Amino acid sequence: MLQISARFYCKIAKQQISELPKISKPSKLLDFKQLHHPTKVPQTPVPTAFPDATNNSEIEIDAKTIQLLERLSLVDLDSEQALATLKSSIQFADKIEHIDTHNVRPLYTVLEHQQLQLRNDRVAEGDCREQLLRIAKVTDEDYYVSPPGNIPLEQLDK
């Protein structure tokens, strides 16, 4: 009985496939090589011109500021490459700070065509600081203490 019904369905499927319209022109198919942007992510960096409201002079960072940044970020900034990266990041931040965003609405999600349901900003469960601090292995002044990065926490004289 099972073989008969399976064969019956195969015959129906074969008839339906034969009744489908034939694609006569394969040129109507989408050719991804002809698209300017086949994906939403560009394959190469896209150069963007920023308004040049600031001067492009070299940024000078004193040793005390570098020590403070090393202590806060737990990243060693001794190499020239690390300092160059830090300076270029500061210059980039300075450039984007001068971009006019007066008439630009805030972006809550990167999906521009979908609504993002925002919840009310209120405390649902609160006053559990002591309970959360008991879970931590190491605390200092009611803060979690994380393991250090690539430099010791003690300050070294440079």
UniProtKB/Swiss-Prot annotation:
<dbReference type="GO" id="GO:0032543">
    <property type="term" value="P:mitochondrial translation"/>
</dbReference>
<keyword id="KW-0648">Protein biosynthesis</keyword>
<comment type="function">
    <text>Allows the formation of correctly charged Gln-tRNA(Gln) through the transamidation of misacylated Glu-tRNA(Gln) in the mitochondria. The reaction takes place in the presence of glutamine and ATP through an activated gamma-phospho-Glu-tRNA(Gln).</text>
</comment>
<keyword id="KW-0067">ATP-binding</keyword>
<dbReference type="InterPro" id="IPR003837">
    <property type="entry name" value="GatC"/>
</dbReference>
<dbReference type="InterPro" id="IPR036113">
    <property type="entry name" value="Asp/Glu-ADT_sf_sub_c"/>
</dbReference>
<dbReference type="GO" id="GO:0006450">
    <property type="term" value="P:regulation of translational fidelity"/>
</dbReference>
<protein>
    <recommendedName>
        <fullName>Glutamyl-tRNA(Gln) amidotransferase subunit C, mitochondrial</fullName>
        <ecNumber>6.3.5.-</ecNumber>
    </recommendedName>
</protein>
<keyword id="KW-0436">Ligase</keyword>
<keyword id="KW-0496">Mitochondrion</keyword>
<dbReference type="GO" id="GO:0005739">
    <property type="term" value="C:mitochondrion"/>
</dbReference>
<dbReference type="GO" id="GO:0070681">
    <property type="term" value="P:glutaminyl-tRNAGln biosynthesis via transamidation"/>
</dbReference>
<dbReference type="GO" id="GO:0030956">
    <property type="term" value="C:glutamyl-tRNA(Gln) amidotransferase complex"/>
</dbReference>
<dbReference type="GO" id="GO:0050567">
    <property type="term" value="F:glutaminyl-tRNA synthase (glutamine-hydrolyzing) activity"/>
</dbReference>
<dbReference type="GO" id="GO:0005524">
    <property type="term" value="F:ATP binding"/>
</dbReference>
<comment type="similarity">
    <text>Belongs to the GatC family.</text>
</comment>
<dbReference type="Pfam" id="PF02686">
    <property type="entry name" value="GatC"/>
</dbReference>
<keyword id="KW-0547">Nucleotide-binding</keyword>
<comment type="subunit">
    <text>Subunit of the heterotrimeric GatCAB amidotransferase (AdT) complex, composed of A, B and C subunits.</text>
</comment>
